[in-house]
């Protein structure tokens, strides 16, 4: 209802796509501006899909999961470039929390940390938000 109201009031057509479990680029449609919120949630979904039994996680599988997530983000970027649009990726920063002891959380932290770094390195701009204050990193 809020989206409909906003579309009518502002003359801007936008919507929220939730529950993206694979092929996020395919969900973009013709939207020129995309906010990909919760890269961390998407990473968790990919981890669960590619390694349902965390005891089977290997360094090789971890790298494969990282490549899959990064490829999905790059596919989204390519689609946005085709539309001459912009994309914002929102994610969690894993380096400021207490080091986990749970094997799944350890793998998640390593994977998301690597993915975040790769995405940030290839982005035009990078911001960090703490206590509601944004800091431009790049």
Where do the PLM segments sit?
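Conserved P-loop
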Residues: 1-29
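Short, conserved beta-strand edge motifs with alternating hydrophobic and charged residues
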Residues: 17-18, 35-37, 89-90, 129
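Short, well-ordered secondary-structure micro-motifs
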Residues: 1, 27-28, 46-47, 99-101
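A basic- and aromatic-enriched beta-loop-alpha substructure that forms the phosphate/nucleotide-
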Residues: 21, 32-54
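Flexible, charged surface loops at secondary-structure boundaries
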Residues: 26-31, 81-83
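A structural micro-motif
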Residues: 12-14, 32, 85, 124
């Amino acid at each position: 209802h809020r989206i409909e109201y906003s579309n009518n009031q502002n003359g801007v057509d936008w919507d929220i796509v939730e529950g993206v479990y694979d092929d996020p680029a395919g969900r973009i449609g013709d939207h020129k501006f995309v906010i990909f919120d919760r890269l961390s949630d998407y990473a968790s979904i990919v981890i669960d899909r590619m390694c349902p039994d965390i005891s089977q996680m290997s360094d090789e599988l971890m790298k494969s999961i990282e490549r899959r997530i990064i490829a999905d983000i790059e596919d989204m970027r390519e689609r946005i470039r085709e539309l001459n649009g912009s994309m914002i990726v929102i994610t969690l920063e894993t380096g400021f929390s207490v080091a986990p002891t749970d094997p799944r959380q350890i793998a998640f932290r390593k994977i998301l940390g690597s993915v975040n770094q790769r995405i940030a390195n290839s982005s035009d701009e990078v911001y960090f938000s703490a206590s509601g204050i944004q800091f431009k990193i790049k």
